[in-house]
Amino acid sequence: MKLKKPYDLIVVGGGHAGVEAALISAQKHCSVLLVTMDKKAIGRMSCNPAIGGLAKGQMVREIDMLGGVMGPLADRSGLQFKILNRSKGRSVWSPRAQIDKRQYESIVMKTIINENIETIVGEAVELLIKNYKIMGVVLRDGSKIKSKSVILTCGTFLSGKIHIGDRKILAGRMGEENSDGITESLGVNTGKLKTGTPPRLDRNSVDWNRTAPTWGDDAPTPLSYQTREFNPPNDPCHTVRTNKLVHQIVGDNLDKSPMFTGDIAGTGPRYCPS
């Protein structure tokens, strides 16, 4: 593998954090290499295709004030925008956007290319360290890439595991391999966080007449302070309710749930952090 002179920065992982780290560094005229296990997955939205929400909306705007791109890119790919908690005081209002996830990752990739950030497909398994100083990374195939600094934004992929009922899959995300090795090379104690992911439904299989549509704001507010022209669509979300049959199905299958079998012992967050 032939790569140019040592980079100023290597970013490991191409999710939201990795994209922000790579872009802001490139804008500061650093030479940046983004290491990802799948170029098509850069900027991919794993779970609920939304940006913002309670607490997270404030974080998006803080990123925006620091020169980040999540806000403006979300404004360009949003399907519905809404300020949550309007029934309460303004201090707890929070912006949220439902996103076209495919359009979002497409815009992210174009932005990466426009900033001349180099990308390489590979799995970083070890840090190069000399005299307590970072010197680069080692890839799974043995390649060594040198840099002045490294930022790890591996997210759920580090020794990731997925539970589906009583099945367990080693994966960073559904359909994508996890990453092993670099965690051990860090020499620090690590822990795991858990989150639950909703099932995906084929929209053509849903009787929408039996659902209640919920709309975004009539006068939508962009997530980014950088956004000037803003006329997004207002696609509805749909609310459904459970019934006794659903409760019975859940109750009859609790013995297959990792939350109840002891396979997962952690308590999930009240509001999903993804």
Language-model region placement:
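Short, flexible hinge/linker loops that cap or flank conserved catalytic cores
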Residues: 2-3, 144
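Beta1/beta-strand and adjacent pyrophosphate-binding region of the FAD-binding site
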Residues: 3-17
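Conserved N-terminal/central alpha/beta ligand/cofactor-binding core
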Residues: 6, 23-130, 141, 149, ...
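Active-site helix-to-loop segments that bind/position phosphate- or nucleotide-bearing substrates
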Residues: 253-274
